[in-house]
């Protein structure tokens, strides 16, 4: 897993998980603001622009983040925030380790299965997945 870091290493740690089709740069502006008071960690989720591997599952990303926090921050950080896909990964993290962070911000997580749209979503993902690694497409999506 590749991570971007902002701020001094002796500060409270905030980890922000970007949404699908986005990447670490989604939080670049807010990280510049937070870095004077916090150490900000921005993991690049698997399969997204700048990552070192293909996306496999929410669970594997969650396990990788738990391992990263265990290995680098003694198993606990101040806050983890997640947007969309990042929020779903965060929910999986919290279901496995509810004490991994003092605070959690969950934005736009899919928490109730939508059975009727699963087939449509699968088709659309298969058609558009190649665009997820294109930075120009991610930035265009972010602007909307």
What are these regions (language model features)?
Residues 6-52:
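Conserved HGGG/HGGXW glycine-rich cap/lid loop of the alpha/beta-hydrolase fold
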Residues 13, 39, 77-79, 102-103:
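Structural signature of beta-strand start/N-cap positions in the alpha/beta core
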Residues 22, 47, 87, 111-112:
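Active-site micro-motifs of SAM-dependent methyltransferase domains
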Residues 29, 92-96:
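Active-site signature of alpha/beta-hydrolase-fold catalytic machinery across serine-
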Residues 41-81:
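Active-site loop/oxyanion-hole signature of alpha/beta-hydrolase fold enzymes
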Residues 82-90:
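Gly/Ala-rich beta-loop-alpha elbow adjacent to hydrolase catalytic centers
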Residues 95, 101-132:
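Flexible "cap/lid" loop of the alpha/beta hydrolase fold
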Residues 109, 136-144:
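Helix-loop "lid/cap" segments that line or gate small-molecule binding pockets
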């Amino acid at each position: 897993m590749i991570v971007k870091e902002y701020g001094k290493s002796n500060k409270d740690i905030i980890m922000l998980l970007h949404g699908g089709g986005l990447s670490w740069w989604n939080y670049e502006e807010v990280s510049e603001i937070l870095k004077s008071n916090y150490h900000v960690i921005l993991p690049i989720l698997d399969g997204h622009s700048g990552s070192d591997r293909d996306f496999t599952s929410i669970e594997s990303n969650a396990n990788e983040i738990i391992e990263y926090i265990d290995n680098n921050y003694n198993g606990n950080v101040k806050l983890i925030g997640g947007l969309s896909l990042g929020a779903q990964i965060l929910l999986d993290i919290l279901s496995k380790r509810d004490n991994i962070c003092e605070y959690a911000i969950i934005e736009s997580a899919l928490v109730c299965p939508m059975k009727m749209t699963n087939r449509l979503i699968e088709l659309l993902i298969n058609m558009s997945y190649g665009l997820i690694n294109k930075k120009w497409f991610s930035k265009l999506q972010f602007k909307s």
